[in-house]
Amino acid sequence: DLLEEAKKAKVKQVVFMRACTEFGEILPSVDQEHPLDENHPIWPSSLYGSIKSSIEGFCHYYYKSRAFDLAILRPVTVYGVRPQLDKSEWFQTIDYLATNYNVDLKGSTKYVAVDSVVQAIQKVIGNSEASGKTYHLIDGHIHNLDLGKLIAETIDSFGECEGVMGEDGVPMSNKAAKDLGVEFPGQKRIVEYIKLIHKLQGEYGGERNIQNW
């Protein structure tokens, strides 16, 4: 068990990160004025969610027993350039629109830039005030159809974006992370990312996966 080994090794701090997706049932009190925060109970609706939730429980057990300091980070969909370029978030959409293909899009995405995630890690490491706390890392929410149109506009594509709007999703709070000092740049960072992926795609290419369309 990794946590037990960390205790034996006298590790001073553990930072546990997991996807912020598995809350299961959402309380009816959650709305735009009262977004889902870190205190919301977790009732996983899948085995995967149950496992992730149980790991958080183990982490808190070791923290409460004073084995080590603990901080938990829960990012939503993280976007950023990956070493394997075509695995970068939204690469396929950018690539297809860059070659003026039409794309069909549906659904929606809660997003956070990898820069913000790294910043959060830096803010909690060695920070005693963050010990025992959980932080949601979310910058915003965008419909994939709107994202496609933003991509087309940013790279001057002649390709058209078709499809249906996704659901608005559950409002989530990032107040705790902001109070920690994490910055969330919003859609302007997405535009910068789109331009960077477009530039890198032109220089290095990437593997197209037509089955996804």
Positions of PLM-derived features:
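Conserved sequence/active-site signature of Rossmann-fold short-chain dehydrogenase/reductase
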Residues: 22-23, 78-80, 142
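Mid/C-terminal beta-alpha module of Rossmann-like enzyme folds, strongest
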Residues: 108, 120-169, 173, 207-212
